[in-house]
Structures are given as C-alpha cells and as structure tokens.
C-alpha cells in the first residue's frame, strides 16, 4: 500500500492544482496530513499556509472554491497533483485565473496579468 511521505519536508508536501479539463496549472500550495485528509473527504481543496500558520480551504473568502475531480501522487509519494473544477473565475488571490501569469521573456520576468476580479473588493477586511 502506498503511503504519502510527509517526512521529507517537515510534515508538508507540495500540491499542484490543475484544471481537470484543460490541464492548466492553477496554483501550487502545501498540504499536511490533515489538509490532505480533509481534501479527500470533503472533495474541496484544503491547504496549510506557511505564512499564516493555519489551515484554509480554497475559496473560503473569495467563493472561488475548487471541486476535486482526481488526486494523483508521484513515484516518490511526496507530492500530489489535484485535478479540480475551478468554481468561480480565478484560482489566484490576485484575481488571475492561474497564479502562473509571470513569464520569463528576453532575459526578464514579464507580468501577463489579466485579473478576472478585483482582489481589493473580494478580500475586504473589516
């Protein structure tokens, strides 16, 4: 039986989130055993924020949730790919469809931002 290896990175594994239809990589985040278990049980993506040191469900603030369609692990069982149906226009907190909108071009990083929502409106605090 395959067991996910959370030991290599201090209890965390990278999770590559991919659109289940197009194959586009939407985001990469980290999971621990608890968030992987929640994701597999709920069918929604859950992550561990290293910055905020807390658990969070994708879309809990924005409403842009992700419905899990398929979960795969790599040959070392230390990374997962989660294929999702993206509910709402964007996966990235910047309002972009994908977090990967900055491209290396002509020796520099070039932003190809096309926000689908205004993060200042969606993530109002207070």
Swiss-Prot record:
Cofactors: Mg(2+); Zn(2+)
GO molecular function per UniProt: magnesium ion binding; phosphoribosyl-AMP cyclohydrolase activity; zinc ion binding
HAMAP family in the record: HisI
Family under the similarity heading: Belongs to the PRA-CH family.
UniProt-listed Enzyme Commission number(s): 3.5.4.19
Name this protein carries in UniProt: Phosphoribosyl-AMP cyclohydrolase
Keywords attached to this entry: Amino-acid biosynthesis, Cytoplasm, Histidine biosynthesis, Hydrolase, Magnesium, Metal-binding, Zinc
Pfam families in alphabetical order: PRA-CH
Pathway as given in its UniProt record: Amino-acid biosynthesis; L-histidine biosynthesis; L-histidine from 5-phospho-alpha-D-ribose 1-diphosphate: step 3/9
Catalysed transformations (reactions): 1-(5-phospho-beta-D-ribosyl)-5'-AMP + H2O = 1-(5-phospho-beta-D-ribosyl)-5-[(5-phospho-beta-D-ribosylamino)methylideneamino]imidazole-4-carboxamide
Tagged with keyword Glycoprotein: no
First-tier enzyme category under EC: hydrolase
Cofactor binding note from Swiss-Prot or TrEMBL: Binds 1 Mg(2+) ion per subunit.
GO terms of biological process kind: L-histidine biosynthetic process
A GO cellular-component term linked to this record: cytoplasm
Species this protein is from: Geotalea daltonii (strain DSM 22248 / JCM 15807 / FRC-32)
Disulfide bonds: none
Binding site for Mg(2+): 74, 76, 78
Quaternary structure and partners: Homodimer.
């Amino acid at each position: 039986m395959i067991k996910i290896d959370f030991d290599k990175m201090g209890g965390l594994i990278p999770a590559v989130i991919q659109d289940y239809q197009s194959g586009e990589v939407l985001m990469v985040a980290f999971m621990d055993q608890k968030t992987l278990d929640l994701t597999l049980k709920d069918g929604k993506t859950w992550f561990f924020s290293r910055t905020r040191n807390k658990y969070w469900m994708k879309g809990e603030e924005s409403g842009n949730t992700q419905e899990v369609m398929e979960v795969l692990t790599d040959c070392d069982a230390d990374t997962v790919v989660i294929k999702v149906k993206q509910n709402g226009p964007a996966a990235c907190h910047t309002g972009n469809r994908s977090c990967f909108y900055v491209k290396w071009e002509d020796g520099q990083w070039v932003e190809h931002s096309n926000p689908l929502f205004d993060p200042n409106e969606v993530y109002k605090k207070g």
